[in-house]
Amino acid sequence: MPLPDFHVSEPFTLGIELEMQVVNPPGYDLSQDSSMLIDAVKNKITAGEVKHDITESMLELATDVCRDINQAAGQFSAMQKVVLQAVTDHHLEICGGGTHPFQKWQRQEVCDNERYQRTLENFGYLIQQATVFGQHVHVGCASGDDAIYLLHGLSRFVPHFIALSAASPYMQGTDTRFASSRPNIFSAFPDNGPMPWVSNWQQFEALFRCLSYTTMIDSIKDLHWDIRPSPHFGTVEVRVMDTPLTLSHAVNMAGLIQATAHWLLTERPFKHQEKDYLLYKFNRFQACRYGLEGVITDPHTGDRRPLTEDTLRLLEKIAPSAHKIGASSAIEALHRQVVSGLNEAQLMRDFVADGGSLIGLVKKHCEIWAGD
């Protein structure tokens, strides 16, 4: 399928996707019932969409195009009420978190969807292992060239986004020692990590043509980069965050990305170059492994900075943009989080350290989601 022309969007408009866990009490393992839930809610959703993701244990909640985080929060709140009623009616529960702490990938059923079945044929067991749960945020752009500039700008802050959203310390019944283990699942995919370097939309079109020669790429949706342009929506999509445990934190993360995008495209503070990515995977690893306690390294100067310190600096820089787009509440909430030194991964570990089981942890996450 050829790459579509870049659809012109209103700059800084917002779209948010949350991949949720469908679980089966009282054991709280992943259920394989998302299709049943989608059938139950599809005629009751008035704004946004509830749909499939890769496997039957995943349920995606997606907003429509929103002007600001308040509109997105309203859509999510309405969807949440409908979904919570459906899971109650079907004796299921739902929660956030980037990974389920003890599910077995071998049990996961890929959705009966042509695209996902084709992906299963291409990637085999890797697709079942990709039963992990992320938050994706789309930001509108006026042109393809703006999208490429924004993508490179946002890529500088991938460690910050990962650390602030880290919520996947447990996997396959084990403490991984990572704050966010979810991104590691994609390390075997040939398109893992950052997008290959291009400097404008014309070069991106050439890159996509080259990738399509592999016969593994039919559309932009087949690319699993950390951040990717979405020409059919006219957006840049940030894909590195774990699904938060609460809607409020998900909305705050979206506000952070929207405000950062506004600052980047309004101020144009960087002259991007390929060398910017020299230490990308090392800095990304620091955020995944240590969360806010990680240390990032400047590829140009060699300077090393605590991620906590650099995140506070980012929040300060984007505060005026956040005020202009109605996202100040998100930046203030994230500032409090950074100062406290806590993320959701640490809260999960604290629960287990206090004697809680992994089954109890999932149960707690369901209660948190339902009570937010």
Curated annotation (Swiss-Prot):
Catalytic activity: L-cysteine + L-glutamate + ATP = gamma-L-glutamyl-L-cysteine + ADP + phosphate + H(+)
Entries under SUPFAM superfamilies matching the protein: Glutamine synthetase/guanido kinase (SSF55931)
Keywords recorded for this protein, A-Z: ATP-binding, Ligase, Nucleotide-binding
Cited Pfam families: GCS2
Enzyme Commission numbers on file: 6.3.2.2
GO biological process: modified amino acid biosynthetic process
Record flagged with keyword Cytoplasm: no
Domain of life: Bacteria
An annotated Gene Ontology molecular function: glutamate-cysteine ligase activity
tRNA processing keyword on record: no
Family statement: Belongs to the glutamate--cysteine ligase type 2 family. YbdK subfamily.
Subunit structure comment from the entry: Homodimer.
Function comment: ATP-dependent carboxylate-amine ligase which exhibits weak glutamate--cysteine ligase activity.
Official protein name in the record: Putative glutamate--cysteine ligase 2
Gene that encodes it: ybdK
